[in-house]
Amino acid sequence: MNSYLLNRALGTVSLSAFHSAQTTRLVHNLEPAPGIRFSSTKSSSSESDEGFAHKAGANVLAIDQYEGRFMVSGGADASVHLWDLESRAAELNYTHEPVSSINKFSHDAAHTHAITSVSIYPFDPTPSTVITTSHDGTLKLSALQPEAITPVHTFNLDCTPYTHSLSSHPSSPLLVAVGTSEKQVRLLDLRSGLSTHGLPGHSSAVLSVSWAPHQPHILASGSTDNRVILFDIRRAGHNSAIATLDMDDAVGLVSPRSAPASYRSRAAFSSHARAHNGAVTGVRWTSDGSYLVTAGQDARIRVWQAATGANTLVHFGPRIQNTSSSHLAERAPLIIPQGYMGAGQETLLWANFNDLDERGEIFVLELREGTFIKRLRVPGLMARRPPTQGRSNALSAARINSLAWRGNGASGEGVEVFSAHGDGTVKTWASRESEEAPTEAEEIEQADRKRKRDVLEEVYRGFMSV
């Protein structure tokens, strides 16, 4: 980093290159910040008090994309909280309290079952509307106010919604895509307050949906039928499904002019194409729309070229876990937005999921090459009692249900990541200088040195007592 500072002073490095180098360093220096807590009750004077954002479990998180100041969390207790992240400034010991909240006891129109997804309306500079789905079979639009969160409209879906997505493209048609326990992707019109139509194509529940950032009419979806389908919402009926991703296709759709005469490109849409050998739990686009990243219950994360649909064959290693569970939910990688990493160094964060062996791990991985960058561990888990063999860890701090990215954390001095956990806590991961946060290897070396000093001191005392 010192060389970049010198070159910046000399004017030999561009501002964008310096910015990428700095933000890359900050991402690589992400570490747990256990002193930053989120508590939905009045903060305790005891620093050892963990503090719980939700009583039954924190399920989902969303941060406003304009200033990154406000975060919304949804819990298994059907509550929704709004948090002001700027109230902390740059302190590393702070307990956040919700600015406003709603639960089934505070409002008659509130959700009655666990929250499954949450997002903040993307077109307001100051967040004013939040969108939530729940196991009660509804999608709700709620107004964010200083003292309360007030539902203003409810879409009754008559099925279980697992996820939803609203495009932030300037030409967005203001349609909310909802993945449900039904086979079709549901489209809800925010302007009319009605359900417009469904997108057929899947043969089972849809767990993840994501609008293309560069095309407001293109939607990607992942399902328990192991398929990823691309839809064009301008088309009707079965014609809306325009392409499927095939994990066995590393070439993709090739133009006849550039392909050999003997080569026959596969059909864009095929009912036999499979993206994973297990349910697809997550679908995400990169910021520029050039790549599509999917996660499946075959313990694989796959990266696809959006232009051709080719599987890039990036392998992230055997450390990835995403096991089958009786509890269906969206589990998608968190892709760091464009501009924070250098060209060709796109990075993603993945929270491992294993019903019977939760370890509280988040992996930082390079998207194009699959290179392992670092592992983040939830602090304090090793000191706790190990889970009972054969029992689910759904209510454990080791269960990471959701990740949220904040690029201007600590009053613009660093980057932050927030994680929602099964025990109801929301934890913070903040970038620190290398001298503030020793690496795992340094910690092991320090522990080894201490052990040797203790042995030598014991031997010395033995000689002195003779």
Could you describe each region identified by the protein language model?
Residues 92-106, 151-155, 197-199, 240-261, ...:
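Beta-propeller fold detector
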Residues 1-191, 198-200, 208, 274, ...:
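WD40 beta-propeller repeat fold
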Residues 1-15, 435-466:
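Intrinsic disorder/low-complexity signal
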Residues 155, 159-268:
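Solenoidal tandem-repeat scaffolds enriched in leucines and small polar residues
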Residues 190, 233, 303-317:
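Beta-propeller blade-edge and WD-like acidic-aromatic loop motif
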Residues 287-291:
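Flexible loop/N-cap segments at domain edges
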Residues 256-280, 285, 386-398, 408:
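Intrinsically disordered, low-complexity acidic Ser/Thr-rich regulatory segments
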